[in-house]
Structures are given as structure tokens and as C-alpha cells.
Amino acid sequence: MGLFLLLLLAGPAHAQKSAASAKAAAADSAARPAAKRQLQATRISEAIKIDGDLDEAGWREAPVATNFVETRPTPGRPEKHATEVRLLYDDAALYIGAVMHDVSPDSIFRELTQRDDLGNTDYIGVFLDTYHDKLNGYGFFLTPGGVQLDARYSPAGGEDFNWNAVWESRTQLRGNDWIAEIRIPYSAIRFSDAAEQVWGINFARQRQSTRQQFFWNEVKPQVDGLINQFGELRGLRDIKPPLRLSLTPYVSTYFNHFPYNEQGKRNSSTSFNGGADVKWGINESFTLDATLVPDFGQVQSDNQVLNLSPFEVQYNENRAFFTEGTELFNKGGLFYSRRVGGQPLGFDDLDGRLRKRTTDSDGQIRQGEYVVSNPGITRLLNATKISGRTKNGLGVGLFNALSNDVYATVQDSTTGQRREVLTQPFSNYSIFVLDQSLKNNSYVSLINTNVTRQGSTYDANVTGGLFRFADKSNRYALKGQANYSRRRGQVFGSTEQVDNRDGYKYSLELAKISGNWNWSVNHGIESDTYDPNDLGILFSNNSISQEASVSYNKYEPFWKVNNLRTNIGLYQTLLYKPTRRQDVGFYSSFNTTFTKNFFSLGGNLDGSLVQHDYFEPRRQPLGEYYVRVPANIGLNGYGSSDYRKKFAYDISLAGRWYAADGARTGRNGYDVGLSPRYRATNQLSFRYNFNFSQRHNEIGYAGSLSDQQVADRPFIQNGVADVILGRRRRTTTTNTVSASYTFTNRMSFTVRTRHYVSVAHYRDFSRLNPGGEEETVDYRRNRDNSFNAFNVDAVFSWWFAPGSQITVVWKNANASYLAGDETLPQYFTNFNNTLNTPHNNSVSVKVLYYLDYLTLRPKKRG
């Protein structure tokens, strides 16, 4: 009886253990990459006409890549509507022919968009890992409407659609199928000169009618990485990297109008520019890319904002030269390309440097000179990139750019005499990168950035090393980074020496990277003297940080949703020198997509204990003064409807609530975002973005004090100004309207209008004393301010030949900053003022023409 009971009890326990083991084994298998498929390339001798017909004999002889596997929304499921891809090659190019079967013509979504803009459409994608390092690759995408997209893939840059190549393609719709024919010339990619080669390869298909994505070689979402989940392309023999040499000259003309309406000043002006981009394949691995006398006047206008923080605003890079092929230079986060050709070094402090003061009889102080013009950008003379990767996986990058002197013009208010003041000396910017790819999706990298300026103005140098080591199963990874910064010379515009103390930064992270459950722990230090900001961007140094996080991701559909992603983490930050507490808090997030209507929903919850903000007071050295930020909690939610519908929208709501801080209560803030979009046809679409935010009883730095202001003088003792904080209400409203009409897959027109207004109203003030103590004071200066920015960007683009483009751009711009009694508190008052103040208008035409040596050279006769 006892033995029977023992077996009876042991049976279920053993079954549960076996079930748990089976479940764990299944999870372990799902977290491993799928077995690699192989595709044999077929060499051809006959010419292939890129017309979308696939009627040449070579297509019938080539092996077929088919039986695609779904990645989302249901990973691992075989495709229902077959995809058939064939690959041919000759001495000059790869040829890809693909047939995508579907249920009906109406199921093939084919919105027309601009190049590199994926709309509401199907697509076929071709991925190449030409060095088979499982880290770096190329992507070429084609939609049924013939729109091309291309991208580079790397650990530093992720998926980068800023990269552009010149390749050919055509598509056709036949009954329930659509066909794609693609030619990728060897000049568009880089590979070794080995006699026989094995490349990583994969094909992707997006079926937009069902929001399904498929890959030929299965890509598991729970496995970290994309390139490492490619199949293999074999049979490439005796292909040689061609001479890659191209020249893209440009000419441009600008007409500008601003209503100065002043005697001696013209309201309109014209200018003509010319230059060229040169690309030269130094060998099979490395390419030189240079821009000579570049013209970036047609790039999209920046989204200007009112900045009340102690840190600069980081703007997007819209200049093509600095976004294409820069993945190596972005290693380590030490390169902020807006520094090159950006705002002059002495732009902000010009008034202080030239201040020659005289005293009037009424005791008011006036300035002896005033600024007539102060250019906000630096003229770039040229820029050059050399980059590539050897067959052994060593990536090498070299960047260099030269900018010219920049001068402001000032005028004496008494004599009327003008003079020029240097705001930026002739400067050289350079970056050097080494990046060694290792097995198991790992790498080791070294990067150096340097800024050298003419004359005695200081030079800056930063050197960094970083690594990532993953285990053989690609489940765990250790990564780290160490940087060292150095400055030598004089502060610009003075004889004062730059503080010669060098600085450093390091970080270390251990993480589980594959599977449903993942986690990470990291630690980092930035010394008080670490400063990479001459060619990089760092908002604040002098910190010690620790963080730990756990995430759970469900990749398969369950209940009523397609997937689920969750994350929760804890963090702590300290001031590095002197060691002081800054912040302790938590964060969490989730997002999911519903199965039936493909509505995406997400949210975030975070909170922190009382923070000590050492940067808001703008007082050096750090550590003595700080602004207390009460314990707070923040919550936001966002949603997106199904983009397949003609009408779709995005919506977001966010709020933050603060605990009472002594007598100060009622501090909170909220944000609202709404973005409806309407696709009238496959060629015409509209989008509206509305964002509104308000901060109540926010405590912040009220501004610097000046002995020229009567209200400031009681708070300046012996030349040392107090730190004045203000309790303020800040309201920000942004409206953006855009429309796009695509004539063909090579011709489009877009227009974007943005109006931004932010108003800060101060209610009372306090003096900040050491140790975070605030003392109420009777400060009488009106510190209210408002900022308006209005921009219109209208662009007509026509790719009239491969790599060749005509663009016609109209820009309308206006920005105004009002302070004190001039501040406009109401939105519509600001809007009317923006419309009624002078605007700058610019119309420009730019023509690029792509010249490729391989197409221009005389062809050998048979």
C-alpha cells in the first residue's frame, strides 16, 4: 500500500517535472537561430533586361528560394501564399527575380511614396552580408509601385535608411501576383576578391493586407540580431570588385527675400553655387567619399524649440553626406555631425566680448557697439570619408572636414564705423576608427576624434575603446566602453588657458540578450572633467550611474493580442565629484498589438525619490548648489490605429505629479498628442500633428543677472550674482501639417508647415542658497518669455536618371523671441504676431547628375 501511494504521488510530480523540462527545452530551442538554408547562385552569360518580365532563360534554370517562414505576427508559421526568388550573377552584377503570389489584385497594397519612404504597401527585400561576418550587411527593398529603399546594417547604426546606392529595378502586376526584377551592380556593394565566396543572404516579404512579414531563412524575434540569422549564398566564383569611381557634380541657385525695408539694404538677393561629390573605390574593401564645396541649403528646417534647460538642444542631421555611410564613425557615440559646419564657437558670447560701455546722463548704460550680422553656421569647405572592411572583418574609417573662418560684423553706434569680429577660426575635424568583427556576433573597436583650430584657440581630442562579447549560443553578452578626453590651448576670444585637466568615462554592462526573459545590469562613470563636446555631444558629465532591468517579451499571438513587450528597471545616479546623491528611481513599460484590428497600445510608468539637480543652478563648481525636485511619478499611454485604413491616427496622453515640497504644492504637468492621417489615394496623403504640453508650478532657473538691469542689482554683491529660481507655468503648443503627392515612383511633391509656440510665465521667485535651501525674495524683474517658430518646407523632387535628381525647394521661415513686458501669453496672439512679422522666403533649384566610370568607359569589342 505504501509503495503504491509513493508511486501514485511520484507520478504526477514526475509528469510535471517532465512538462516543465519540455517547456524549458522548447524555450531554449526558440531562442536559438534557425538552421541556415543555402542558395546556389547561377552564373549567366546572356544579358538580362530589367523589365519585370523574367522571360530570359537564366531565370528558368536558377534554383528557387521559397517556403518563406513568418516572423510576425505569428513566428514560425509557413507562408500561405508562396514567394519564389531566384538569383543570377555575371561579371558585373547580381540579378534577383521574385514572384509574390497573392489571393487577388486587391490584396496587393501599393501606395506610391518617395524613395526610402515605406508607406502602406507590400515589399520584397534582399539582404546581403558580403563579408559573412554576421554583423554588417546591406538591404535592398522594392514595392509593387516600384519605389526603392536601401539600407545599411551594423551594430553601431542598426538599420540605416540614410544610405543610398544606385541600382536598377522594375515591377509588374500579373493577375493575383506581382513580380520584381532587380539588378544590383557590384559597384553598389563591397566584397573581397576571393576566387570563391560565401555570402550571408536573406529575403523578406511584407504582405501588408494581413500585416505579415516573412523571411526565407527564418528570423526569430526572440533571437538577438538580424544579420546572424541569414542563410548562405554559395557558388559565387571569379567575381572581381570593379573600379568604383563616380562623380556627382551639382549646380544650384537661390533667390532669397526678407523685407528689411531699410535704406542701403536690399530686400532680395540671389546666389549661385557649384560643387561635386566624388566616390572612389580605393580597392575592393575601401571607398573614398568626398564632398567639395557642399551646398546644404535645401535640407529640411530644424524643429526649433524654446530651451530653458541647462543643456543644449540636439537637432537631427538632415545633410545627406553626414547620414550616408557613417555607421563606423557613430561607434561609441563620440560623433555629433552637427558640430561640423555648425554654430560658430563664439556665436553666443559675441555681445559680451565686444561690450564697450558708456554712461548716459540718466544713469542708464548703453552699449558702444552693436551687432549688424552674426552668422549662425560655419561655411564648410570640404569633407572626406574613407571607410570599408577587409576580408578578415577589420573595419577602418577615416573622416576629415575643413571649415573656414567666420566673421560677425559690428558697428559703432556713435561713429557708424563697422568692423569684423572673428567668431570661428579655420578648423579641421577628423575621426579615425578601427572595428574588428569577431565570431559570435562580437566586436572590438577603437575610435579617435580630433578638432584642431588655427591660432591659439584650444584643440580637443577624444579617444575611446569599446567591445561586445557574446557567448556561442548568443544568449549572453558583455559590453563595455572607455573614453579619454583632452583639451589644450586658450579659451576662444581670450588669453585664458583652457583647464588642462583631462577627463575619462567608462561603462560596463552584462546582459541576457535572447529568449523571452532578458535582463541587464550596468555601471558607468563620467568624470567631472570629461568633455567630448567639440565633436560629440554630452549633456552632462560628472556622474556615477547604476542600472538594472528585466524584460519579458511574448512574441506569439495569445489571448486577443499578437505580441507583448514589457520592461521594468531600477536606477541610481550620483554626482562624481564631490560624491553626492542625485536620483533614485524606477521605470516600466509595455506595448502590444491587438490581433483583430491591429490597434497598437503601450504605456510607461516611472517614478523617483527626491532629486538633487546640480546642473539647473548653472553654478560652478558643482556640488554646493542644487535644486530640489520633489518625489514624483509619471504615467503615459499611447495608441496607434491600423495604418492599412485610409484614415488612421496616433494618440498619446502623459502626466506627471509631484509631492508637496514644503509650502510649494500643486506641481504637475501633462502632455497631449494627436496625429491623424488620411490617405486619399495611393498617391495623395495628408497628416496633421498636434502636441500640447503644460507645466504647472515648475521650479527653474530664472536667468542670468546683469548690473545693467535695475531689478537685478540688489542680487549682485561684489560682482557675484545670486542664483534666482522662479516658479513658472510653461505652455507649449506645436501644430504641424504635411501633405504629399507622388506623381511616379521617381517624382514627388511634399509640403510641411510647422508652427511652434512656447510661453513661460513666472509667478514668484526665490534665492537659491547652498545645500538646496530656497529663500523667498522680492525680485521685481519680469522674466516671462515666449518663443515662436514658423516654417514651411515645400519640395519637388524628380529622379530623372539613376542617381541624378532635380529638386525645387521653397522655404518660408520666421522665429521670434519676446521677453519681459513684450511677452505674448495667448496662443492666437502669438500666432497672429507670427503671421504679421517679416518672414524670410527662399526659392532654390538644385541639379545633381550622376556620372559612373563603368557606364562611361569605352566598351571592349568582342
Segments predicted by a language model, with ranges:
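Bacterial N-terminal signal peptides
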Residues: 1-10
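Outer-membrane beta-barrel transmembrane domain signature of Gram-negative proteins
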Residues: 218-241, 406-473, 512, 598-646, ...
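Extended, hydrophobic alpha-helical segments in both membrane/secreted and soluble proteins
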Residues: 249, 272-278, 286, 292, ...
